[in-house]
Regions:
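Ser/Thr-rich, Pro/Gly/Ala-heavy low-complexity intrinsically disordered linkers and tails
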Residues: 13-73
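Sec-dependent bacterial lipoprotein signal peptides
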Residues: 1-14
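Periplasmic c-type cytochrome electron-transfer domains
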Residues: 69-522
Length: 522
């Protein structure tokens, strides 16, 4: 598989979903329904799913979720704080999938009449395969593009699948975060070469608006490493140029915010139906669709326009909450996996939950952990209080904040322990993508300071370590050749550290191998 251009994901804010489900692109809307149907895995549409009676803290008998391990064994779950569920707007997941891949929630882009001419200029990010099940002109564009009408003009815009339809074993999976996007360049430099014709073509107004936004975003969203996502920078930059009450765009910044390179690893959508708070730091509370809708902020220039998008976004959220993790496609040693389940229950389930043959019988404790317990890079957890409190204030006073609250300090800055369904497919790991495989998540002493992926072929998967094949390096960005720098993950850089989650360090190699085998069954 070719790496897709750094241009691609910036056309859609990565806020389009904190987590969700794994649906092969072979799925039609009927398949979307069968993955959870109108009821979804939590029961009645929009109802919070069962979490097995998670306790208000991570300790005590109620924290066992029906197993003997987590309750009987002291562990880090004792320090977790339960985040309670809140009602989600009801929606139709079948209609939601249709809206996700056909509606124009990004209202600026490239005129349909110019899209064919744009491909040679825009390169790899326009050569994705078509999305099965779409018809008409949408069957002629890549899976992460949508042809739609704005004010009578046909334009082509990117959709949420730009960041949320990764590849695994050669198969496109809707809901899997992308791990091969290249955001290491300033996209505005490329887009400045795009010729705008003098003749009147429907959609030129939307294209001009799109190009102007990219000039603002481009310099602020340059990442250091291929595969890391600039979701934090995109969100910060866009809201800094908007009036919080009217959503009107300003060419000048309205909020002074720090310029930081903060990497993010897009989480899978299949976690969404279990989580009571979205984002790695758990700051999105209430009905989650408000923060999901922030993905439309690229071109949403009025509250009326946001309300129109909101008219169908509950359906999109229902789809996100209905889909499920994919099944591990390779062989599994059943005996070793059974041994691993026992180790997992004693050492991991207190934070990450328990897993049954039926998703409805799973348990997930929804625990938020303080930084001094989890120990992972603190920048994202502290972003809303230390680095960008103005962003939180803007959001909570905006239209989006009337739907979803941002609470980065409730009750403290920290990180949620995520559900682990399909975790084997979601590398690299930790919230900033700093650890190449799960084996190293379970053994912090062996994590490389500098590393790079061997290649970007999704069919090349490390079945032993559960991650993408990588090479450890003896040097980082400071000593690398310019052409190689963007492929190196340098954990000495700000917000890129790979510390923390040392909870597997005490396991023996045999126990660790057994847990890895068990995770393949999830």
């Amino acid at each position: 598989m070719r790496r897709r251009s750094w241009v691609s994901g910036l056309l859609v804010l990565a806020g389009c979903g904190d987590a969700g489900g794994g649906v092969s692109t072979e799925a039609s809307t009927e398949a979307a329904a069968s993955s959870g149907g109108a009821s979804g895995p939590g029961g009645e549409s929009g109802a919070p799913p069962t979490t097995g009676g998670a306790p208000t803290s991570g300790s005590g008998e109620d924290g066992s979720s029906g197993s003997t391990g987590p309750a009987a064994t002291p562990g880090p779950w004792e320090f977790g704080v339960f985040i309670p569920p809140e009602p989600q707007a009801p929606g139709d997941p079948v209609k939601g999938y249709e809206a996700l891949v056909t509606r124009g929630y990004i209202t600026c882009g490239i005129p349909w009449l110019l899209f064919g001419l744009a491909k040679p200029l825009l390169g790899p990010y326009t050569d994705g395969e078509a999305l099965p099940g779409r018809s008409g002109k949408n069957a002629q564009v890549p899976y992460n593009w949508t042809v739609h009408e704005v004010d009578g003009a046909e334009i082509v815009s990117q959709n949420c699948l730009t960041c949320h339809a990764g590849s695994f074993n050669g198969q496109r999976i809707v809901g899997l975060g992308t791990a091969d996007e290249d955001f290491t360049g300033d996209m505005s430099a490329l887009l400045n070469t795009f010729p705008i014709p003098d003749i009147p073509i429907p959609g030129l107004e939307q294209m001009t608006r799109f190009l102007n936004r990219m000039k603002v975003l481009g310099p602020m969203t340059v990442m250091r490493t291929v595969g890391t996502n600039p979701a934090e920078a995109v969100a910060i930059t866009l809201v800094a140029h908007r009036d919080r009450h009217t959503l009107a765009w300003s060419e000048e910044k309205l909020i002074d915010l720090p310029e930081m390179v903060v990497p993010s690893d897009p989480p899978p959508w299949w976690r969404a139906h279990k989580k009571n708070a979205l984002f790695y730091n758990g700051m999105a509370r209430g009905d989650h669709r408000g923060t999901m809708m922030l993905a439309t902020a690229l071109c949403t220039d009025s509250v009326a326009e946001a309300q129109q998008i909101d008219s169908y976004f509950a359906d999109i959220q229902a789809f996100v909450r209905s889909v499920q993790a994919p099944k591990y496609p390779f062989a599994i040693d059943a005996g070793l996996a059974a041994q691993g389940e026992a180790v997992f229950v004693d050492n991991c389930a207190g934070c990450h939950g328990t897993y049954a043959a039926n998703d409805v019988d799973d348990t997930y404790p929804n625990l938020l952990f303080p930084l001094d317990v989890i120990g992972t890079d603190a920048v994202v957890a502290e972003g809303g209080t230390k680095y960008a409190p103005a962003l939180v204030d803007w959001y909570n006073e905006s239209f989006y904040g009337s739907i979803t609250r941002m609470e980065p300090n409730n009750p403290f800055p920290g990180y949620m322990a995520p559900p682990l369904d399909g975790v084997w497919a979601t590398g690299p790991f930790l919230h900033n993508g700093s650890v190449p495989n799960i084996e190293l998540v379970l053994d912090s002493t062996k994590r490389p300071k500098f590393w790079r992926r061997v290649d970007y072929d999704s069919a090349h998967f490390d079945q032993a370590g559960l991650g993408w094949p990588f090479a450890e390096l003896m040097y980082g960005h400071a000593d690398a050749e310019d052409a190689e720098k963007k492929f190196i993950y340098d954990t000495t850089q700000f917000a890129h550290t790979n510390t923390g989650h040392t909870f597997g360090d005490h396991l023996t190699p045999a126990e660790r191998a057994a847990v890895l085998e068990y995770l393949k069954t999830l």
